[in-house]
């Protein structure tokens, strides 16, 4: 049977504008140690791997706002986190104003 992965899609307002800028950097130069794939102009796909949640060395490269989203996806047994401009705002997660 093929593997079918769960995706959590949430609003990109759950990360700061600064963090979004880091996600937009070319993978080879990205300061965040994650598998990140752009979703055109609307957001990002992020692989939620066990090592991200469990390894404190990897977590030090991940901004806390993004780590909160990753932990939320992990708690809901998702393999992928999709941060999308039109995604749902989750009351348990902090939101940020990108217009500052």
Where are these predicted regions, by residue range?
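Short, compact, well-ordered microdomains
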Residues: 60-100
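Short loop/turn segments at strand-loop or loop-helix junctions that form parts
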Residues: 47-51, 84-87
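Short, surface-exposed beta-strand/loop "edge" segments at domain boundaries and coil↔beta transitions
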Residues: 16-18, 53-56, 88-93
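An N-terminal amphipathic alpha-helical segment
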Residues: 15-50
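Acidic, aromatic-enriched beta-alpha/helix-loop junctions
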Residues: 33-34, 41-43, 52-74
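A short, structural micro-pattern
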Residues: 4, 40, 75-77
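Short, extreme N-terminal segment that most often corresponds to the first beta-strand
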Residues: 1-23, 82-83, 97-100
């Amino acid at each position: 049977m093929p593997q079918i992965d769960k995706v959590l899609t949430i609003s990109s307002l759950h990360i700061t504008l600064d963090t979004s800028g880091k996600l937009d950097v070319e993978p080879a130069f990205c300061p965040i140690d994650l598998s990140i794939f752009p979703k055109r102009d609307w957001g990002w796909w992020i692989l939620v791997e066990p090592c991200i949640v469990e390894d404190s060395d990897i977590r030090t490269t991940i901004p806390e706002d993004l780590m909160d989203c990753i932990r939320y996806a992990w708690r809901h047994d998702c393999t992928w986190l999709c941060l999308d401009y039109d995604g749902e705002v989750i009351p348990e997660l902090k939101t940020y104003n990108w217009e500052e």
